[in-house]
């Protein structure tokens, strides 16, 4: 039986049975591994997929909320700005929707990019957000558990980095729960709305994580 994302991708399993990890039941349907096929990871409650223009209404509403913006250090956009930004993210293929499996409604987003803290190593930088009404339900833990396994097992990264604003205690706790280690503390990392913030630096190494 194929259980890991890597095995499922190789074996082409379409309807794998659920299995338990840390008391949480997970399901994986990795339609994307290579060759340009759309990415589609399905967990117990969520789908992690490529962004679409159909996500505009939810992206504009959630992504412009004070709750999300306060830790992204970004500014509100009008509807046309949100549309252009969404189009840009779709084209760049570095951003993925966290969607409700029940109705495919976007509830958050995952972003990956080059790890600028490291040089000439197989590492990726991870960022994420979730709409306020979807927090405290375990959704981000569920989404990142699947996505991290995808990055290690399918994309074969050796290291994942994440930077979190010092006031964002909940995000730091989430990363630690997922096995990330704090590697550093960057004082006076950025200025947002005339406030200077520090960044907390985290990383997770593939050889420290047991595959799902």
Report each predicted region and the residues it spans.
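Acyl-donor (CoA/ACP) binding surface of acyl/acetyltransferases
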Residues: 31-67, 95, 99-212
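Hydrophobic residues within membrane-embedded alpha helices
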Residues: 3, 10-12, 156, 165
């Amino acid at each position: 039986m194929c259980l890991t994302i890597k095995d499922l991708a190789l074996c082409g399993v379409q309807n794998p049975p659920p299995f338990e990890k840390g008391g949480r039941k997970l399901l994986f349907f990795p339609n994307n591994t290579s060759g340009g096929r759309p990415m589609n990871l399905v967990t117990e409650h969520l789908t992690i997929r490529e962004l679409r223009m159909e996500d505009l209404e939810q992206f504009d509403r959630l992504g412009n909320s004070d709750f999300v913006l306060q830790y992204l250090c970004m500014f509100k956009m009008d509807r046309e700005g949100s549309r252009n930004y969404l189009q840009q993210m779709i084209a760049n293929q570095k951003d993925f929707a966290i969607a409700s499996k029940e109705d495919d409604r976007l509830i958050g987003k995952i972003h990956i990019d080059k790890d600028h803290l490291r040089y000439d190593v197989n590492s990726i930088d991870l960022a994420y957000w979730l709409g306020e009404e979807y927090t405290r339900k375990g959704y981000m833990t569920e989404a990142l558990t699947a996505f991290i396994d995808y990055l290690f097992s399918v994309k074969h990264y050796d290291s994942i980095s994440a930077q979190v604003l010092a006031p964002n205690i909940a995000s730091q706790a989430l990363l630690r729960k997922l096995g990330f280690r704090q590697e550093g503390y960057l004082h006076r990392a950025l200025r947002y709305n005339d406030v200077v913030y520090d960044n907390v630096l985290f990383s997770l190494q593939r050889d420290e994580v047991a595959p799902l």
